[in-house]
Each structure stands twice: as C-alpha cells, then as structure tokens.
Curated annotation (Swiss-Prot):
Any GO BP annotation: translation
Protein name, entry field: Large ribosomal subunit protein uL15
Source organism per UniProt: Ehrlichia canis (strain Jake)
GO cellular component, one term: large ribosomal subunit
Molecular function GO labels: rRNA binding; structural constituent of ribosome
Recorded name of the encoding gene: rplO
RNA-binding among keywords: yes
Biological function: Binds to the 23S rRNA.
Classification of source organism: Bacteria, Pseudomonadati, Pseudomonadota, Alphaproteobacteria, Rickettsiales
Subunit composition and interactions: Part of the 50S ribosomal subunit.
UniProt keyword list: Ribonucleoprotein, Ribosomal protein, RNA-binding, rRNA-binding
Residue segments, region Disordered: 26-46
Length: 156
C-alpha cells in the first residue's frame, strides 16, 4: 500500500504557538465586555490576585497543622565522592595526592566554599592512596582512604 504525498495531505504537525485570544473587543467575539472575569468583585479588577485566598473558606495552609522547624545553626556539608577525587587524579588536575586540602578542592570547583565542612562519601573506587583533609567521612569511604583529618581532636 503506497501512499502518495500530495500538497493537500502533508501534515506539518500541530501549530508551534497557539494564538492568544483577543479580549474585550465586543460581545460578538465571545470574550467581550467582561473578558471572562465575570461581574465586579476584587478578582474582576486589574492587578489583583490573592495567594491562598479561597473565597472566604479557610485556606488549606491554615487548616493543616504546623510541623517542624529549620534550625539556624544547622551545619552545611559539601559532599565529595571518592569517584570525583579519582576522576581529578586521573585527569592530572590533582598532582600532589599526599595533601588534598580544602583549598585544592575549592580551586578545582569541587566545593563551593572553604568555610563549609566536607563529608567524604564512598561512591566510586580509589586506585591510589591519598591523604585528604575532611570533617566527616562515611564508613565505606574510610575503609578506602588513608586520611589526614582537619578536626582530629575538635570533633564532637
């Protein structure tokens, strides 16, 4: 069954952009006079939309109970995987594997700030022995790495 392509049966797909309906241009257009906003009221006026307002009904966020809080003193950790460190060693971006400090990781763009604490995770495998400065480490990463801790006695 061969179908011949003719000019009248070419389908180029749906239109890329739907034309916007012109509002307020007479009752004949279907969206004239009130332009789909109904009559009067706050929502009929321009520049007004009230977030969470449900027409006098108690809003959903006041019906639900308050739960939890965000601590102001929460520590933020920069997570570094072993696979990331190995990739940097393989690409010769880290030359001195005996002293991988926060400054080195910051300069390479691995961590966003030197002030943040570093947590080493054991995702991936290390092929070379490294000494790395860290604040926290997972058990799986600790078994793979010879470590130089930045907080040896300060650790709580």
């Amino acid at each position: 069954m061969n179908t011949v392509v003719k000019l009248n049966n070419i389908f180029s797909g749906l239109p890329k952009k739907k034309k916007t309906k012109v509002l307020g241009r007479g009752i004949g257009c279907g969206k004239g006079k009130t332009s789909g906003r109904g009559h009067k009221g706050q929502k009929a006026r321009s520049g007004v939309s009230i977030n969470g307002f449900e027409g006098g009904q108690q809003s959903i966020f006041t019906r639900l109970p308050k739960r939890g809080f965000n601590s102001l003193f929460k520590s933020k950790y920069s997570i570094v995987n072993l696979s990331t460190i190995q990739r940097l060693i393989d690409s010769k971006k880290i030359e001195n594997v005996s002293a991988i400090t926060k400054q080195v990781l910051f300069n390479l763009g691995v961590i966003p700030s030197i002030k943040e604490k570093i947590k080493i995770l054991g995702d991936g495998k290390l092929n070379t022995a490294v000494a790395i400065e860290y604040d926290f480490i997972s058990k799986s990463a600790g078994s793979q790495v010879t470590l130089l801790s930045s907080v040896s006695e300060d650790k709580v």
